[in-house]
A protein has these predicted regions:
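Catalytic toxin/effector domains delivered as secreted proteins or via bacterial secretion systems
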Residues: 1-162
């Protein structure tokens, strides 16, 4: 079981991390992983503490909290399971592969910001809504840390379509 310190995660008030994913849910997640053109071999289902990329093992652990909470209004809760997988794979895993131990601490606002930002811009086969929620999540991460982010052309395009 991964500790909070060693696991990068999406957080939020999604479905409970204690929910055991069913074989049908896992099959659906595997289709999303395939659509994202991600390496299925690094994903572990119903293992780990919660959904998140582990810098220590180089694996992405998937728990029940990968599933949306449609009763919420927060982008982190509303984003699809595919968007969550993109956050972990095209965000945390990508930057861990690129920078290794030179990354911000797991869970730091800038680590979470860039994971959602990079996934919103670069993950293949996401819907416009997925990209919008990922970008909105990136901005929420900065806001929660008290950091102002300039709205760039990329941010505006993803959020507003222009």
């Amino acid at each position: 079981v991964e500790s909070d310190v060693n696991s990068r995660n999406i957080n939020g008030q999604r479905t409970s991390k204690y929910k055991i994913l069913t074989p049908e849910e896992i099959a659906s997640l595997k289709l999303d992983i395939e659509a994202l053109e991600a390496d299925l071999s690094i994903f572990r289902f119903n293992e780990g503490f919660q959904t998140g990329y582990s810098d220590k093992s180089g694996l992405i652990y998937i728990r029940g909290d990968v599933l949306s909470d449609l009763s919420s209004t927060h982008p982190r809760d509303l984003m699809s399971q595919r968007a969550v997988l993109a956050h972990e794979y095209y965000g945390h895993k990508y930057f861990d592969d690129l920078f290794g131990d030179k990354n911000p601490l797991p869970g730091a606002w800038n680590d979470e910001f860039r994971a959602s930002y990079n996934a919103a811009l670069n993950a293949p086969n996401l819907t416009e809504t997925d990209r919008m929620y990922l970008m909105a999540d990136a901005l929420e991460r900065a806001k929660e840390a008290g950091v102002n982010i300039k709205i760039t052309t990329n941010i505006r395009r993803v959020l507003y379509g222009f």
